[in-house]
Amino acid sequence: MLATRRLLFVLALLAGFLPAALRADPPGRVGRLTVLEGPVLLRMDRQDPGQAATVNWPIAAGAIVDTEPGSRAEIWVESSAIRLGSQTRLEFSTLDDDHVVLNLGQGAVSVTLRDNEAAQEIEAYTPNGRIRFDGPGRYRIDTGGGRTNVSVHSGSARVTGRDRSVPVGAGQAASID
């Protein structure tokens, strides 16, 4: 009887600690910096003053990547490539097992999505609106000067601004102010 009570007590303690331990697990998905040309600054979050980025550094939720004039960077998240052009600021607002949310503050990114699952999980925001990818393809997003331009090389996307939402197919482009 005493052994049973002790066992129940230990199980109750473990049940209390298990949810906390599960929450502490890092996400299974991270990005990797795979190409760096020129000075690129990496900040782990908005409070981080930043450091020079290095190849193969992991990118997690909250990370901010800034490219200097004449620099570029490439980040892979599983089978998806995100290429940053010169003078670009990109924040990974969400990067977990279910979603990748990119916030492009300025500059240009090219996004290559290789499968439907990746396309459904990734979306991008700019100061002017949101871009949702409808399927695999190659996309370019440029933002600055109060305007965002979205070009679809292959695939299709939906671009949503303040007062409209438009589909953009392969070989097409859309602008939002």
Question: What residue ranges belong to the model's regions?
Answer:
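Bacterial N-terminal signal peptides
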Residues: L8-F17
